[in-house]
Amino acid sequence: METNYLKRCFGNCLAQALAEVAKVRPSDPIEYLAHWLYHYRKTAKAKEENREKKIHLQEEYDSSLKEMEMTEMLKQEEYQIQQNCEKCHKELTSETVSTKKTIFMQEDTNPLEKEALKQEFLPGTSSLIPGMPQQVPPSESAGQIDQNFKMPQEINYKEAFQHEVAHEMPPGSKSPF
């Protein structure tokens, strides 16, 4: 019974201690055995602490590695969000620019349209716009069309401009041409 208890509690430790006592043959084997067991327990405790310390360090390393991975993933996600924001911003600015251009173009054409309408209603002004294809009013029949009708390519722009300017000039003034 004592042997089983010693084996179970001390196991290999006691067997090594007795082997060491038999090998050294000290003058006081019991005191030697006590010192040897004390030293064995001290080294076993140090080994256990080292093992726990290694486990703790490994856990810290794993957690810091996970934290670094999470940080990297967050940075990558932040970079993607920033890229998407820049892309959306570029799209919005291009849409804004195109909208502003459209508004500007519409604002630019409004004075021209008003001027054309104004000239159309002035007495003695020509409704022909130089450089633009002209349509014959539907009231004229095909046989009554003037044979001297010129295509837009054939119109002398200088003559057309002089004609328009002559109507706007006060009587008795000289033509700039």
Swiss-Prot record:
Pfam families xref list: Dpy-30 (PF05186)
Membrane-crossing residue ranges in chain numbering: none
Assigned GO CC terms: Set1C/COMPASS complex
Matching Gene3D superfamilies: cAMP-dependent protein kinase regulatory subunit, dimerization-anchoring domain
InterPro entries noted in UniProt: Dpy-30_motif, DYDC-like_DD, Sdc1/DPY30
Record-stated family: Belongs to the dpy-30 family.
Name of the featured protein: DPY30 domain-containing protein 2
